[in-house]
Amino acid sequence: MATSPAEPSAGPAARGEAAAATEEQEEEARQLLQTLQAAEGEAAAAGAGDAAAAADSGSPSGPGSPRETVTEVPTGLRFSPEQVACVCEALLQAGHAGRLSRFLGALPPAERLRGSDPVLRARALVAFQRGEYAELYQLLESRPFPAAHHAFLQDLYLRARYHEAERARGRALGAVDKYRLRKKFPLPKTIWDGEETVYCFKERSRAALKACYRGNRYPTPDEKRRLATLTGLSLTQVSNWFKNRRQRDRTGTGGGAPCKSESDGNPTTEDESSRSPEDLERGVASMAAEAPAQSSIFLAGATSPATCPASSSILVNGSFLAASSPPAVLLNGSPVIINSLALGENSSLGPLLLTGGSAPQPQPSLQGVSEAKNSLVLDPQTGEVRLDEAQSEAPETKGVHGTTGEEIPGALPQVVPGPPPASTFPLTPGAVPAVAAPQVVPLSPSSGYPTGLSPTSPRLNLPQVVPTSQVVTLPQAVGPLQLLAAGPGSPVKVAAAAGPTNVHLINSSVGVTALQLPSSTAPGNFLLANPVSGSPIVTGVAVQQGKIILTATFPTSMLVSQVLPPAPSLALPLKQEPAITVPEGALPVGPSPTLPEGHTLGPISTQPLPPASVVTSGTSLPFSPDSSGLLSSFSAPLPEGLMLSPAAVPVWPAGLELSTGVEGLGTQATHTVLRLPDPDPQGLLLGATTGTEVDEGLEAEAKVLTQLQSVPVEEPLEL
C-alpha cells in the first residue's frame, strides 16, 4: 500500500496550524487514500477475474500445456476523473490548501496531467503556495477558464507578479509599482474578458446604463433592480449613476466629452422613483421668467420683482435704474431723467413699477349694475372719446344718447360699488360731437400709491413706509357708475391688506380725483403718453425721514390719458343735482351704444350712498352744472408718509371745464390754482379755501396754461 509523500513546503495556513492538527489532517488523508485504494482494488480484482475466466473458456489448452499467470493488480492509485474533480472542488471551496497539496501529490502523474478544470485550478493554487510562479503562469495560459472563476484566477496571477517583483527588488511595492506591473503584464485572455475597467464600471455596464438613460431618465425601483442584475452592479451604484448623469446634463457637462467617472462613490438610500424638484421647477421657472404684459401699473409689496419686465420700465427702490443698463424709463419714446434718486438707505419701501403699452382687453364684471357694461375711453392717438361695451365687438361709438331711468356704466379699476338707483335727474338734449384729447399737466409722476385701509380706520397708509395716513373721502353721491374689468394681461396689482385699499389717482380727463380699491386685486390699465417726441420728462425722487418727496416738471404739451376697462363689482357715485345742462361740445355719457342719434340724455337713476360710508371733507373741488362736470365733489388728501411739497409741486390752473374749444376735453380756464399742500387732518385743499371761490374762478375768463419750475424743499410748508 502506497503512502502519500510528505509535503515539500507547507503553505502559510499549514505552517500556522498546530502539530496535532497537522497529524489529524495527515491521518484523514491516509484514511481517504486507503478507502479509495480499497475500492479501486476490488474493482481491479473483479475485472481480472472476469478476464481470466474468459481466457480459460475461449482458449482450451491441452493437458500438458501450462496455464497463464493472472495479471497483477496495479499498486498505484486509480480514480475516475469525476472523483478527482469532486475532491479538488471540495478542498478548494473549504480553503484547505495543505490538504489539497497532499491529495494532488498522492495522485499518479497521468491523473494530474489529464485533470479537468477543478484539478487545474487546484494545481494553480498549490503552485502559488509553493512559489512556483512559472508553473502558475503556464497553467493559467494553458486553457480558457469559465468566467465565474476569472476573479479568483486574476487575483492569483496579479499576486504572483507582485511577489515575484518584491522578491527581485527586495522591498515592498507601492501603488505606482503595482500599476506599472499591471500595465507591463496584462492579464491573460484565458482569465480575462478583454474589457477595460473604468474605475468600478465596465464598458458593457456603462453601455447598458446609457441605453436605459436615453429611454427613461427616471427608472422605477424595479427597473433599477433589473438593471443592476444585468450589469453586475449594486442598486446603490445604479441609483448614483442616474443621479450624477442627470446632474451633469442639467449643468451642461453631460453632452460634451465622455466623463470617466460614472459615480461619485457615495452610497445613497434614495430610491429616486420620482422626478427631482429641480426638473419640475424648469417649467415653472420658464413660465415665471416671462415678462408681465405692458401697459400695467404694479403696486406691489416690499419684495421687488426678480426680473425687469420690459426695457421701458422703472422700479422704485430697485436695481432697474442702474447707469449701465438701457434707459430705465421710456414713455412712448421719450426718455425720463431721474434726478436725486436716494432710495438706497430705505430698503423697506415697496416697489412701484410703471410700464406703458397698449390697452387691455375688457372682461365682463361679476357684479354689474346693468346688463350692458360700458366704458368711456379717451383714445390718445385719435383724440376721440368713445363708449366701449364689454359685450359688443364694435368698441367705438360717437353719438350716444340715453333715455329716462337708465343707468350709466363707466370705466375705472376697482371702485367701491354704489347702492341701487333711487332718484333721477334730467340731462338736456344736445348733439354729441367727438372731442379732442385734453392736454393737461399731471401733478405727480406716479399714477397711484399702494395703500391699505381697514374697514374702521379712516387713515390711508403706505405699507412698510409710514404707519399712519389721512382720509380719502367720497361725497354724498348718487347713481353707481359701473366699470369694466381689465384683461388678464394688464393687471393693477395692489398690496394685500386686511380691509379695502385706497389708491390716489390723478385723472383729469374724467374729473376723478380719488378712488377706493377693495382688497381683491383686479387688473386695470393706465397710459402716460407724451405726444411731443424727444421731449424729456424730468422727475425727482427723494426719501427723507421715512417720506417720499416726488417732484416733476412736465412739458406743457404732455398728454395724460387713462384707458380703464370695467372691473367687477365697482361703481363710482355721482353727485345728485336737480338738473345738469350739457352745453354744446360737452361730453355726455350714454348707457348703450345701440341708442339712435339725435335723442336726448334722459334722467339718470341714482340713489345716495349710506351716510355712514361717506366722510365729508371741509374742502373739495366741485364741478357745477355750468362746467359740465360729470363727476364732482371728491376730496383726496395725500397720505402723511408720501408728501408733495407745495414749492415742489408744479402749479397749474384748476377748474377743468368741458367745452367745445380747440383745446379738447378738460381745457383749463380759470385763475384758480390747484395745489397739493401739506396734509392736514381736515383733508386735502384743492384750489381755493372754499367752494365759493372755486365757483367764482370757474366763471372767469380762460387763461393760458402755466407751469412753474419745481423746487424741492427739505421740509413741507404750511399754508
From Swiss-Prot:
GO MF annotation: an example: DNA binding
One Pfam family hit: SIX1_SD
Segments of skewed composition (Basic and acidic residues): 272-282
Keywords recorded for this protein, A-Z: Activator, Developmental protein, DNA-binding, Homeobox, Nucleus, Transcription, Transcription regulation
CDD domains: homeodomain (cd00086)
SMART domains (UniProt xref): HOX (SM00389)
Protein name: Homeobox protein SIX5
Organism of derivation: Mus musculus
